[in-house]
A protein has these predicted regions:
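Bacterial N-terminal signal peptides
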Residues: 2-9
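Extracytoplasmic
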Residues: 64-67, 87
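Ligand-binding loop in jelly-roll beta-barrel domains
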Residues: 61, 98, 118-145
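A short, N-terminal "cap"/entry segment at the start of jelly-roll beta-barrel domains
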Residues: 11-65, 152-186
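Glycine- and acidic-residue-biased ligand/ion/polar-headgroup-sensing regions
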Residues: 85-97, 102
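Conserved short histidine dyad/triad with adjacent acidic residue
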Residues: 51-53, 68-83
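Short acidic-glycine-tyrosine-enriched beta hairpin
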Residues: 103-119
Length: 186
């Protein structure tokens, strides 16, 4: 967890130093959240699953970081994709995952960390028999827009997106899925 906190500080400092002057941004509000608190959302595509966005421009005005949590059921995965302009850290809280990162492949367990530089292909699969819990942190806002686009709130009806809508979500969230053109996500 110390690695995650250090990375958060580094990302925030680097983002603050490298960002150009912006006009009248909202001041981020501090948050204290329990494990299940935040913006809970349900993925549109099978297999069903949910995630919680905790820190984002919409949730608390954060201009430099996005953070959330997600559980991955056995056999499920984050398909091969890359983020355009955002680094990401995934911290494995519980369980075991198989990670393909660039030209590397490795199994990681609870306490493991994945650092994903922007523009690097990555996939993460639950390689075990129990649910995996992860914490994800992005160095800049953007991908949470994709996550919202491809999900619904718990009280909303889950409806699938067309391939064109999926592509639009990807553009909005600064992400490219490896097989997106021929084979939309999931």
């Amino acid at each position: 967890m110390a690695v995650l906190l250090v990375a958060l500080c580094v990302f925030q400092t680097r983002s603050a130093q490298s960002s150009s002057a912006t006009t009248s941004q909202a001041v981020p509000k501090p948050l204290l959240l329990e494990k299940n608190e935040g913006e809970r959302r349900i993925w549109r595509e099978p297999p069903p699953g949910d995630f919680i966005l905790k820190v984002s421009p919409i949730n608390n005005g954060s201009q430099h970081l996005v953070m959330g949590t997600e559980d991955i059921t056995p056999g499920d995965e984050f398909p091969t994709h890359k983020h355009l302009g955002q680094d990401e850290i995934i911290y494995i809280e519980k369980g075991a995952v198989r990670v393909h990162l660039g030209d590397q492949e490795r199994d990681l367990h609870a306490g493991g960390t994945v650092f994903i530089p922007a523009y690097t292909w990555v996939s993460v699969k639950n390689a075990g028999t129990e649910a995996v819990s992860v914490v994800f942190v992005f160095s800049a806002p953007g991908f949470e827009n994709y996550m919202r686009c491809d999900s619904v709130l718990p009280n909303e009806k889950v409806t699938p997106l067309s391939p064109q809508e999926q592509k639009a979500c990807g553009r909005e969230g600064h992400v490219i899925y490896k097989d997106f053109e021929d084979n939309p996500k999931k």
